[in-house]
Amino acid sequence: MNSIQLIIDIILILWLLILTVLYLRKKSLNLNIVKNKKIVRAKRYIVFYVIAESKVKGDDLERVVRNSLKDLLGNVWLNIANPKVVTYKEDTQEGIISTNRIGYKAVLASLPFAKEINGNKILIVPRRTTGSLKKAKKLIGLK
């Protein structure tokens, strides 16, 4: 009985030793992987349209989007997301907001808080989020 227990203990110790070696090898391999810089700089484009009482200008729209993000989450998230209105068609009141991969959800969350431009009530409605500017322009009818 005692010898059977000794054999089981030795097998368990060997098994744990093998698992430990495999784990440490895998961990050392992961440390040598260089992070992909393209992922860090990946952009997201939010296609939106504006419902307003009268026509809205693109410059005013960018200011309101940035202020709504600042009011909702503060200066830190404003600097992280850095939203910019890339394209805005005043006739159809459609446009594209450019942001990064980290902050696009913060920008989406702050859009309903943009309620007024120069005394004019507005509502910014996001239609779609894409990863390429070409597809975003195609969605609003450019090129």
UniProtKB/Swiss-Prot annotation:
Name of the top EC class for this enzyme: hydrolase
Cystine residue pairs: none
Signal peptide per UniProt: none
Molecular-function annotations in GO: ribonuclease P activity
Keyword Transferase: no
Name the record gives this protein: Ribonuclease P protein component 2
Keywords recorded for this protein, A-Z: Cytoplasm, Endonuclease, Hydrolase, Nuclease, tRNA processing
Enzyme Commission (EC) number: 3.1.26.5
Annotated localization: Cytoplasm
Family: Belongs to the eukaryotic/archaeal RNase P protein component 2 family.
Subunit structure: Consists of a catalytic RNA component and at least 4-5 protein subunits.
Pfam families, sorted: RNase_P_Rpp14
Keyword Ribonucleoprotein appears in the UniProt entry: no
Species: Saccharolobus islandicus (strain M.16.4 / Kamchatka #3)
Reactions mediated catalytically: Endonucleolytic cleavage of RNA, removing 5'-extranucleotides from tRNA precursor
GO CC annotations, alphabetized: cytoplasm; ribonuclease P complex
Function of the molecule: Part of ribonuclease P, a protein complex that generates mature tRNA molecules by cleaving their 5'-ends.
Coiled-coil stretches: none
